[in-house]
């Protein structure tokens, strides 16, 4: 299955808030299908919704998510927490969390178009796994800085997680350490994703 490029608000109405997918929010009471979904939710449906939340928030394909679950399963720690750490340490997600891009798809585009440097080298792979003490900057040209400047100006500095720091004047971000579970930007039960 390829990456989702369809209407984003439909997914948000179905799955709940996905800040990485879009900044838009649906109008209240605008879902006519909601009244028909009453009663008990099946366990399979709950697990599937949690998995879909993870996929759409981080912009993953089914195969990528399975690969991350496989890698997390080999770790000695909790599989769910390792899975979230792997996803949160992706370059596209770190750009989004730093405020250098308004959404994760926007961050993917910045990386694919070679506007981003990691430790002084151009990286054009959005799934690049960042490590502690990595320095993320933009290219020195005006166009790259302009793209990031608009996003930084509109982002909220209070939402910056503890494992990241940003210098807004130099358009530079720093990964301090590996993420703790409480700073994940998505409300999700990762154990249900692993069970699925």
UniProtKB/Swiss-Prot annotation:
GO terms assigned for molecular function: rRNA binding; structural constituent of ribosome
Assigned keywords, A-Z: Chloroplast, Plastid, Ribonucleoprotein, Ribosomal protein, RNA-binding, rRNA-binding
Q: Where is this region: Disordered?
A: 1-43
Major localization listed first in the record, in broad terms = plastid
Q: Matching PROSITE patterns, A to Z?
A: RIBOSOMAL_S4, S4
Cross-referenced InterPro entries: Ribosomal_uS4 (IPR022801), Ribosomal_uS4_bac-type (IPR005709), Ribosomal_uS4_CS (IPR018079), Ribosomal_uS4_N (IPR001912), S4_RNA-bd (IPR002942), S4_RNA-bd_sf (IPR036986)
Signal peptide, first to last residue? none
All copies of domain S4 RNA-binding, residue ranges: 89-169
Bias class Basic residues marks the residues at: 1-14
Keyword RNA-binding on this protein? Answer: yes
Please give a single GO biological process term from the UniProt record: ribosomal small subunit biogenesis
Q: Where in the cell is it found?
A: Plastid, Chloroplast
Keyword match Transport: no
Stored Pfam families:
Ribosomal_S4, S4
SMART domains (alphabetical): Ribosomal_S4, S4
Q: State any GO CC term.
A: chloroplast
Q: How does it assemble?
A: Part of the 30S ribosomal subunit. Contacts protein S5. The interaction surface between S4 and S5 is involved in control of translational fidelity.
- Report the protein's function: One of the primary rRNA binding proteins, it binds directly to 16S rRNA where it nucleates assembly of the body of the 30S subunit.
- Give the PANTHER family listed for this entry: 30S 40S RIBOSOMAL PROTEIN, SMALL RIBOSOMAL SUBUNIT PROTEIN US4M
The UniProt similarity line reads: Belongs to the universal ribosomal protein uS4 family.
**Per its UniProt record, what NCBIfam families does this chain match?**
PRK05327.1, rpsD_bact
Q: Which HAMAP family match?
A: Ribosomal_uS4_B
Q: What is this protein called?
A: Small ribosomal subunit protein uS4c
What species is given as this protein's source? Answer: Melica uniflora (Wood melick grass)
